[in-house]
From Swiss-Prot:
GO cellular component: cytoplasm
Region entry Disordered, spans: 1-26
Protein residues bound to GTP: G87, D88, E89, G90, K91, G92, K93, G117, H118, T119, R474, G603, N604, G605
Example GO biological process: IMP metabolic process
Cofactor notes: Binds 1 Mg(2+) ion per subunit.
SMART domains per record: Adenylsucc_synt
Organism: Trypanosoma cruzi (strain CL Brener)
Positions annotated to bind IMP: D88, E89, G90, K91, N115, A116, G117, H118, T202, K216, Q328, T343, K472
HAMAP family per the UniProt record, alphabetical: Adenylosucc_synth
Family label: Belongs to the adenylosuccinate synthetase family.
Additional record remark: Parasitic protozoa lack the de novo purine biosynthesis pathway and rely exclusively on the salvage pathway for their purine nucleotide requirements.
Localization annotation: Cytoplasm
Protein name: Adenylosuccinate synthetase 2
Function as written in the Swiss-Prot or TrEMBL entry: Plays an important role in the salvage pathway for purine nucleotide biosynthesis. Catalyzes the first committed step in the biosynthesis of AMP from IMP.
């Protein structure tokens, strides 16, 4: 870690991560005094030599899926498609490409739950939104499984996912099999709702159900299909957590009902009707037993059940190839201590997939294809995100649940905003350019906005970066090489970058190649994993990523890349085989240089086939 010579060297009080909280909320639409003070410090940070790297840029050429992806698949028995950032990376396209390989016949989700989500299209162009169902359901001749370490709300699964398959006449009964999953009940979702800040959770009950799971309470799918007395007993034991929470918080059923109505008040159904009915039920355990009897056990449309882990091992022993479809991502994994307070509750790294798939990794070769998204790399929820345009909890703190909560015409002129940001807020023409952006103001008919706020709102609008169902805005930012380097070191080298055709709309693009730490206090030192972080410290790609307590105060050092507006790569505008623009080559070269990844493909459109494979 480089030390800035000009920083205040006086040793101040040392704080541990447990004592350090996220920056206090003082968020405004316009640039405030605190933001100007941060910039006044950061603008004097000396440039790092890495801003001039790489010295030369590679030229990349297009190749076929058979020449790039298929050899990787054919060398291995287990292929994992995993998120490389904070989820929502556009993994579905790569998942479909792997699933379409003739030798890949077994496709599985093996952990996490319906808080994951992906949009996929079948050969007829029909759109499907899946949360827990594997994408291979739309490929003929593939068997799809939901493994026992997944968590499932079977009511939601039937209403939102299986219903789509039934209406589209997809023969899922022959293709979809469910393991002995842990059951997400209405009270898990209510605990999630009552304990979460706006825009900070998917409200799918993930933390509460995993708490039930690790404390060996709760129920699994097999309990619904067996002795009802055991089912009742286990539900009565587990539901005590919910009743205890209400007692501690002094909440009644009427209070909870009002909270549900408020959450659904803007027309987006975040709390489904059966959860509301649970709140209203006098005997809540009996309500659940009847609910599961009527809509799961006695439902002829419920998919077949099986021992998924056994089926997976049997498939491998027969020489079949298995694809594990990763939910969320590396940095959203609860098994990664750097962000563990703001992650999901399952291990969603590639190693987490491997562990929950329950096969002998000594016998079968595995490979990981990581997926990142750029431009407009995004994260939902709360937590640190050094490369974002605004603080990760900005929308949450402002009470913004959906884009509809913003002024109707606020920051809709994406082109003007990105032009101001990349051509005026940065100063690459100066000798002392250090990769820090100036907090300029953007003005439209609705008011004046800090340029970071304008970029965050405009990116969410322009790129559709909001939840497919919740419409919750994602917080966008730069491609982050500091975080991606660790992902590559742990589960690389293969990387697919989705949505790169978005770059068609930019004058320039930014890539985070390092962070500078600044907490706004002159002498405070933060001690994480035995290292002291002081104002002005630089954290580069390849160095240890600090914990979240420090990451809240890390600011991106941004390398600017030339755009390619005049030579768009979108599938609707580009002819297959056309040379890739210089700006694209600059972008890919920079990412490979700083992360050591091997980029195998880039996305260039919404359709499943809109992928450009990169000649290796």
């Amino acid at each position: 870690m480089d030390k800035q010579a000009e920083r205040d060297q006086s040793a101040g009080p040392v704080k541990t991560p447990q004592e350090t909280q996220p920056p206090a909320h003082n968020y405004t639409y316009h640039t405030n005094a605190a933001q100007r003070a941060v910039y006044d410090y950061l603008k004097n940070v000396k440039p790092i030599p890495e801003l001039a790297e790489p010295k030369t840029y590679k030229t990349y050429e297009e190749a076929s899926v058979e020449a790039v992806l298929y050899p990787i698949i054919e060398k291995h028995q287990v292929i994992m498609v995993a998120g490389a950032f904070f989820g929502d990376e556009g993994k579905g396209k790569t998942v479909n490409a792997v699933a379409n390989h003739p030798g890949c016949t077994f496709i599985a989700r093996v952990n996490s739950g319906e808080n994951a989500g992906h949009t996929v299209y079948d050969d007829a162009g029909r759109k499907f939104v899946f949360n827990l169902a594997p994408s291979g359901l739309l490929s003929k001749g593939k068997r799809n499984y939901v493994g026992p370490e997944c968590v499932m709300d079977p009511i939601s699964f039937m209403e939102n996912e299986v219903k789509q398959l039934i209406e589209a006449n997809v023969p899922y009964k022959e293709q979809l099999f469910i393991g002995n999953v842990s059951i997400v009940t209405p009270y898990h979702k209510l605990l999630d709702l009552l304990a979460s800040a706006p825009n900070s959770s998917t409200l799918k009950g993930m933390a509460p159900i995993h708490a039930s799971k690790v404390t060996k309470r709760g129920i699994r799918l097999d309990h619904i299909f067996n002795d009802q007395s055991v089912l009742r007993s286990r539900l009565r034991k587990d539901i005590d957590t919910y009743f205890g929470f209400l007692k501690v918080k002094g909440l009644s059923d009427a209070d909870v009902l009002r909270r549900c109505e408020k959450e659904n008040g803007d027309g987006v159904v975040r709390v489904p009707p059966y959860v509301v009915e649970f709140v209203q039920a006098e005997d809540k355990v009996e309500y659940l037993v009847k609910l599961y009897m009527d809509r799961v056990r006695n439902n002829k449309n419920f998919p077949a059940r099986c021992d998924v882990a056994h089926e997976l091992r049997s498939a491998l022993s027969r020489g079949e190839k298995v694809m594990l479809e990763g939910p969320q991502s590396y940095w959203l994994s609860n098994a990664r201590e750097k962000f563990w307070e703001s992650t999901t509750s399952a291990d969603t790294t590639a190693s987490g997939l491997l562990a929950t798939a329950q096969y002998n990794f000594q016998l079968y070769s595995s490979v990981v294809i990581n997926v990142h998204k750029a431009p407009g790399s995004s994260r939902v929820g709360v937590g640190a995100n050094p490369s974002s345009f605004v603080a990760q909890d900005y929308f949450s703190a402002k009470g913004v649940k959906t884009l509809r909560d913003l002024p109707e015409n606020m920051c809709v002129d994406f082109d003007s905003i990105q032009k101001l940001f990349f051509t005026k807020a940065f100063h690459p023409e100066t000798k002392e350019y250090n990769g820090i952006w100036e907090p300029l103001e953007f003005e439209d008919s609705t008011g004046k906005y800090n340029i970071g706020v304008a970029m965050a709102v405009a990116s969410s609008r322009h790129h559709g970066e909001c939840g497919a169902v919740t419409k919750k805005p994602r917080v966008c930012g730069f491609f982050d090489c500091v975080l991606q380097y660790e992902v590559n070191a742990v589960q690389g080298p293969y990387l697919s970058i989705s949505a790169l055709d978005r770059g068609d709309d930019y004058d320039k693009l930014g890539i985070t190649i390092a962070y500078v730490y600044y907490n706004g206090k002159n002498n405070e030192v933060l001690n994480i994993n035995g290292r002291e972080y002081k104002n002005g410290d630089i954290i580069k790609a390849g160095e240890a990523v600090p914990g979240e307590a420090a990451l809240y105060y890390c600011h991106p050092i941004v390398k600017l890349i030339n755009g390619w507006k005049q030579t768009p790569i979108a599938a609707s505008k580009r002819k297959p085989g056309d040379p890739l623009p210089r700006g694209v080559c600059e972008f890919l070269s920079t990412v490979e240089y700083f992360t050591k990844a091997k980029i195998i493909s880039i996305g260039n459109g919404p359709r499943g086939k809109d992928i450009i494979y990169i000649k290796q």
